[in-house]
Amino acid sequence: MELHTVLIMLSLLPLLEAQNPEHAINIGDPITNETLSWLSGKWFLIAVADSDPDYRQEIQKVQTIFFYLTLNKINDTMELREYHTKDDHCVYNSNLLGFQRENGTLFKYEGEVENPSHLRVLEKHGAIMLFFDLKDEKKRGLSLSARRPDIPPELREVFQKAVTHVGMDESEIIFVDWKKDRCSEQEKKHLELEKETKKDPEESQA
């Protein structure tokens, strides 16, 4: 479930006319070095859609999520740093993401469990989207994230169409209300600490 909320990474799959969800989407564009560089940085979770009513109930408890992705080229992983606003309090988490370059699959590791999702990138809108468990009608889900918390109506409509094209209903979509964010101060403190940490080695060499 955690992967749904956070990976919130991303991407927009082509929307085709076929009615069968397995054929309606061409899942998994290859992940290149250029893709990984583009993904690096800050993202805002915009919306989540899920066919599991229990999961929708849980995700509604999480008011906002934004996250940072940092590429590690040495071992082909990405660091995921998440800021969740829940019950008007900020919760910070960090984790590692793995990926398969050939089929555009992302993995979040939770203990020994490997949770996959399928990634496509929509550079035109500065947005990314993840697709989960499309073959399972009871667990099927999508998430949309963007570089900015305020998205244009066009992108909102694209996400809504993506939801219906995989056999889900627009009523299963939950949009994030960014006025409820409570993590800006904690993020600021972390960024200041990172800045100071980068300064220290330089000062010691001076």
UniProtKB/Swiss-Prot annotation:
Glycosylation sites: N33, N75, N103
Keywords assigned by UniProt, alphabetized: Acute phase, Disulfide bond, Glycoprotein, Secreted, Signal, Transport
Gene Ontology biological process terms, A to Z: acute-phase response; regulation of immune system process
GO CC, alphabetical: extracellular space
Region span, Disordered: 187-206
Cystine connections: C90-C183
Gene3D superfamilies in the record: 2.40.128.20
Superkingdom, natural source: Eukaryota
Localization (cell): Secreted
Chief localisation class: secreted
Range of residues in the leader sequence: 1-18
Family: Belongs to the calycin superfamily. Lipocalin family.
Annotated domain remarks: Contains a beta-barrel that binds various ligands in its interior.
Function per UniProt: Functions as a transport protein in the blood stream. Binds various ligands in the interior of its beta-barrel domain. Appears to function in modulating the activity of the immune system during the acute-phase reaction.
The protein's name in its UniProt record: Alpha-1-acid glycoprotein 3
Species for this entry: Mus musculus
Lineage: Eukaryota, Metazoa, Chordata, Craniata, Vertebrata
